[in-house]
Amino acid sequence: MAVVTLAEMMEAGAHFGHQTRRWNPKMSRYIYCARNGVHIIDLVQTAICMNNAYKWTRSAARSGKRFLFVGTKKQASEVIAQEAARCGAAYVNQRWLGGMLTNWTTMRARIDRLKDLERMEGSGSIAMRPKKEAAVLRRELDRLRKYLGGLKNMRRLPDVVILVDQRRETNAVLECRKLDIPLVSMLDTNCDPDLCDVPIPCNDDAVRSVQLVLSRLSDAINEGRHGVQDQRGNDDSEG
């Protein structure tokens, strides 16, 4: 059974690309046509790619790979946190800090600092500090939670990064390429498929489209790790 149906993708608006003047010619093989100055994504190609991405992600999860979900645009932020949490993956959904992967030693120290501050808050240690010092510590805690809260359980670099909006997350893409970390990417018509390993051509701006794709990838991770079939009963064997 298909991982996602054409009807589901149509309903989610996954077929709407960007204005034709903003396209990347490398995406031509995934484009069906142009209407009223907007490219329409070929959902048959999307379905094929989604099936491939599901199998690839499921296989990676089955072999014990660690995943990181990345998407900082407003319409993706909540979905990123929700679906990453559902499959036990780490996530970045507010801002990509430079060196988040390539300077992991420093980033790991900041995550440890976040955990220390949370322990201090939980024990009441911060509340017992002088008012000004407590305020400074709480501001630091709030900032670290905002940007690094989704990484608290990530002890090592991820093996796979799942990305929403390649153009916005350029720094994340470059860091992954530098470290040879495979990228599973939603690709709108202005993206470059050469900069990812597992492409999923679709609308990366619509919340429902993002939700549809990420929920399926989260299902794939859960199935790979726990052998749990999702609600669609996908039981395709590995290609």
Swiss-Prot record:
- Is-annotated flag, keyword Magnesium? no
- A GO BP term, please? translation
Cysteine disulfide partners in this protein? none
Q: Which GO terms describe its cellular component?
A: cytosolic small ribosomal subunit; organellar chromatophore; plastid
Q: Which GO terms describe its molecular function?
A: structural constituent of ribosome
Q: Which SUPFAM superfamilies match?
A: Ribosomal protein S2
* Main location, first listed in the record: plastid
Q: Where in the cell is it found?
A: Plastid, Organellar chromatophore
Q: Name the keywords, alphabetized.
A: Organellar chromatophore, Plastid, Ribonucleoprotein, Ribosomal protein
Name one matching Pfam family.
Ribosomal_S2
Q: Which family does it belong to?
A: Belongs to the universal ribosomal protein uS2 family.
NCBIfam families in alphabetical order = rpsB_bact
Q: Which PANTHER family match?
A: 30S RIBOSOMAL PROTEIN S2 PROKARYOTIC AND ORGANELLAR, SMALL RIBOSOMAL SUBUNIT PROTEIN US2M
Annotated protein name in UniProt: Small ribosomal subunit protein uS2c
